[in-house]
């Protein structure tokens, strides 16, 4: 809205006024720049001298820098920048002019007229509305809307992916179920049904009852099997014992075919004073050996008995020992026989306790002061269980006693066992009648 000059003004309109406003509007449009706060800056007017540029600051307007006259942009040159001015009120010079020209004339009347013509422009600047903010609000709204739509799109993508994964899982489970069902039906058709399979369906109680009854039957069968196993074991043991008795009975027969003077049934005995002590198992410490009425260890006289079953032997400690046998009379000794069970029959699985190296001595008198060496021999446990050794009794001599000295065994570290010892020869009678009859002894 433009204002005309007041009637009392010293300046009057003339033909130059339209051109001034047209040029002023063009220059102001080109020189005015708007900022975000709605303020504008006006450039220098057309035809304004250089002194006006310098005096602009005195009237509240920004001073113009020196340049092209008129302050307009010509031939593409840039217009000088102006300092910002306040749009909230009039300048001091303009206010003084409106109130009746109280201010002093700053120059020529043409300058005053130009200042008065600038008042409508100043009024228009004061009445200009604030810049619209609809553009910034719409841009903010669209930004929020775009962010919201992007979040919604991301959520929809996640939901779609979950749906796809669930669909894939459902498809896999379905295919697996179909495969298992086909496999089950194939097994049912391929495997023939059992002949004894019950056709009717059993209840849970009936099933438990049958399982319990079958369990009892199994327990009974196990008890019977254990009983049969014990019986078979006992039968085998009895059979083995009977076979062993038969074998040793055959062995105990007069296999040597020579008289035995070291037999307890014909009067032979053991001289305990000159015989090694019995073996006592100190590791196990047999309880029955401590009782006087029961002695588990066999005495030395067992070697004078024909019973040579495994375990029925005389054992002495270590691998060296001796035994002295009283003969039933004076006997011209010719042979000595040792008997030991074979390793296959021994309970320990071997014959390491059998004697190996031994020597035989003949005792001349009852005081046993004189010993006659009759030979040294080796008992080969792997050859035969009965082995006879010829004595070196030449010329033949009669002895009332015979000593068997064991020098070593077959490797047992704790004891040595003697099962049976036989003494062969000719018994010499001490009476004169026998001497007259010319009884001579010799080996048989």
Curated annotation (Swiss-Prot):
Gene: Spag4
GO cellular component, as recorded: cytoplasm; meiotic nuclear membrane microtubule tethering complex; microtubule; motile cilium; nuclear envelope; nuclear inner membrane
Composition skew (Low complexity), residue ranges: 19-36
Pfam families (UniProt xref): Sad1_UNC
Transmembrane portions of the chain: 137-159, 166-188
Keyword Cell inner membrane on entry: no
Organism: Rattus norvegicus (Rat)
Coiled-coil residue spans: 204-241
Function recorded in the entry: Involved in spermatogenesis. Required for sperm head formation but not required to establish and maintain general polarity of the sperm head. Required for anchoring and organization of the manchette. Required for targeting of SUN3 and probably SYNE1 through a probable SUN1:SYNE3 LINC complex to the nuclear envelope and involved in accurate posterior sperm head localization of the complex. May anchor SUN3 the nuclear envelope. Involved in maintenance of the nuclear envelope integrity. May assist the organization and assembly of outer dense fibers (ODFs), a specific structure of the sperm tail.
Stretches for region Disordered: 1-109
Molecular function via GO: identical protein binding; protein-membrane adaptor activity
Name of this protein: Sperm-associated antigen 4 protein
PANTHER family per the UniProt record, alphabetical: SAD1/UNC-84-LIKE PROTEIN-RELATED (PTHR12911), SPERM-ASSOCIATED ANTIGEN 4 PROTEIN (PTHR12911:SF16)
UniProt xrefs under InterPro entries: SUN1-5, SUN_dom
């Amino acid at each position: 809205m433009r204002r005309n000059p007041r009637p009392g003004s010293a300046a009057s309109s003339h033909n130059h006024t339209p051109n001034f406003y047209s040029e002023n509007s063009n220059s102001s449009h080109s020189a005015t720049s708007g900022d975000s706060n709605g303020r504008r800056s006006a450039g220098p007017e057309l035809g304004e001298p250089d002194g006006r540029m310098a005096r602009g600051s005195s009237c509240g307007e920004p001073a113009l820098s020196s340049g092209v006259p008129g302050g307009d942009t010509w031939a593409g040159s840039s217009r000088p920048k102006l300092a910002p001015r306040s749009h909230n009120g009039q300048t001091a010079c303009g206010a003084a002019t409106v109130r009746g020209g109280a201010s002093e004339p700053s120059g020529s009347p043409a300058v005053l007229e130009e200042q008065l013509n600038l008042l409508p422009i100043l009024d228009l600047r004061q009445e200009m509305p604030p810049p619209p903010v609809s553009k910034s609000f719409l841009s903010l709204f669209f930004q929020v809307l775009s962010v919201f739509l992007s979040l919604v799109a991301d959520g929809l993508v996640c939901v779609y992916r979950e749906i796809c994964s669930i669909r894939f899982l459902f498809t896999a489970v379905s295919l697996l179920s179909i495969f298992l069902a086909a496999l089950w039906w194939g097994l049912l058709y391929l495997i023939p049904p059992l002949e004894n399979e019950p056709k009717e369906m059993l209840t849970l109680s009936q099933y438990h009852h049958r399982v319990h009854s079958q369990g009892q039957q199994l327990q009974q069968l196990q008890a019977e099997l254990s009983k049969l196993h014990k019986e078979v074991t006992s039968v085998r043991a009895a059979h083995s014992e009977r076979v062993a008795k038969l074998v040793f009975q055959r062995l105990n027969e007069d296999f040597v075919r020579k008289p035995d003077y070291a037999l307890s049934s014909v009067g032979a005995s053991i001289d305990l004073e000159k015989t090694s002590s019995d073996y006592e198992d100190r590791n196990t410490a047999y309880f029955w050996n401590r009782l006087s009425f029961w002695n588990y260890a066999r005495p030395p006289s067992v070697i004078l008995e024909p019973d040579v079953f495994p375990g029925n032997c005389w054992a002495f400690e270590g691998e060296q020992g001796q035994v002295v046998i009283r003969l039933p009379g004076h006997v011209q000794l010719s042979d000595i026989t040792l008997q030991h069970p074979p390793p296959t029959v021994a309970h320990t699985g071997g014959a390491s306790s059998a004697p190996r190296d031994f020597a035989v001595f003949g005792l001349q008198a009852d005081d046993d002061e004189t010993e006659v060496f009759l030979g040294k021999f080796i008992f080969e446990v792997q050859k035969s269980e009965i082995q006879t050794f010829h004595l070196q009794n030449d010329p033949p001599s009669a002895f009332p006693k015979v000593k068997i000295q064991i020098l070593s065994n077959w490797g047992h570290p704790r004891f040595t066992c003697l099962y049976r010892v036989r003494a062969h020869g000719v018994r010499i009678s001490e009476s004169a009648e026998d001497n007259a009859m010319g009884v001579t002894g010799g080996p048989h």
